[in-house]
Amino acid sequence: MIPFLDLRQINMRYQKEIQQAMNRVLESGWYILGGEVDDFERKFASYCGAKYCIGVANGLDALTLIIRAYDIGLGDEVIVPSNTYIASILAISANGATPVLVEPDINTYNIDPLKIEEKITSRTKAIMVVHLYGQSCDMESINLIAKKYNLKVIEDCAQAHGAIYNGKRVGSLGDAAGFSFYPGKNLGALGDGGAITTNDAELAERLNVLRNYGSHKKYENLFKGVNSRLDELQAAILSIKLSYLDDDNQRRREIAAYYLEHIKNPFIHLPTVTDDKAHVWHLFVVRVKEREAFQYYLAEQNIQTLIHYPIPPHKQKAYSEWQQESFPISEQIHSEVVSLPISPVMSREEVERVVEAVNRYGY
């Protein structure tokens, strides 16, 4: 079986370094908000081209805290793509604000800048962009719209660690950005983790306080904060894996390039790439009309596939108020997408087997 993602194989490459780091943290006697977190925050901010990084417990918290730090809440609206993972939308709802869904570009799957402006009202406070599957959104167009209406731009970078747009890495393209370090991400922890990057000193200071019960000094609380802190063990592991991220992303690009060149099947719609050197290919997503049959066929060929994502947000029971709304592009995407295996530890033989199997489908 060719697995969709072999996390054991990915992480065993760093076994010695990780065990040394874990021993170092264990022996330090300090496990929350210590030197390892400080070190990772410095490294990751520098990597992203941002001035500040604030480590938090997970990617959802990262987005939720950004919105909270901007005092966006009840009565406010936030523009967000209609085909994102639900966490992007939950972060808005958690603050009492209203998510306003905007359809994606059918080719890139990212939010369509041409459809944003018509959804802006006097209540709109921010645009949340999601760099879906590893490819940056059209940030030049989006930032121009945000500037015109005096809106904040929040990046959801959960699937795009290291992706580049016009020479700059995601995480430095808007006002603030949220990252997830869920184990399956391009930069994944051995558990949950997240981070926020920004160039705004005042925002960074407030986020540092909000993530720690709203406390700027022990037992003194400026805000009604939360407990959302990246722990020392995960920070130490992430520092190790960050040093290999560019190499891993390059291997993903090589596999994606092979897929794009060699998959030739009229039943398979391949992804559209705006810049092949900037995409980090968190996922390689194709579209197939008869998705269930395609997945069943590949499973019989011992190839694991996944769906990202089967149900669009407006069809989720949690958001029943949207059930009657129509988002035809999102609905088409969610009914057809299939993610093929892609990871930095896939062998050439495995990649070739995937291509051969996909090319035989339907014949």
UniProtKB/Swiss-Prot annotation:
Keyword Transferase assigned: yes
Keywords: Pyridoxal phosphate, Transferase
Domain of life where this protein originates: Bacteria
A family per Pfam: DegT_DnrJ_EryC1
EC numbers on record: 2.6.1.90
CDD domains according to UniProt: AHBA_syn (cd00616)
Signal sequence annotation: none
Reactions catalysed, as given in the entry: dTDP-3-amino-3,6-dideoxy-alpha-D-galactopyranose + 2-oxoglutarate = dTDP-3-dehydro-6-deoxy-alpha-D-galactose + L-glutamate
Alphabetical list of Gene3D superfamilies matching this protein: Aspartate Aminotransferase, domain 1 (3.90.1150.10), Type I PLP-dependent aspartate aminotransferase-like (Major domain) (3.40.640.10)
InterPro entries, sorted: DegT/StrS_aminotransferase (IPR000653), PyrdxlP-dep_Trfase (IPR015424), PyrdxlP-dep_Trfase_major (IPR015421), PyrdxlP-dep_Trfase_small (IPR015422)
Top-tier EC class: transferase
Cofactor: pyridoxal 5'-phosphate
UniProt family annotation: Belongs to the DegT/DnrJ/EryC1 family.
Biological processes per GO annotation: polysaccharide biosynthetic process
Gene: fdtB
Residues modified to N6-(pyridoxal phosphate)lysine: 185
Protein name as it appears in the record: dTDP-3-amino-3,6-dideoxy-alpha-D-galactopyranose transaminase
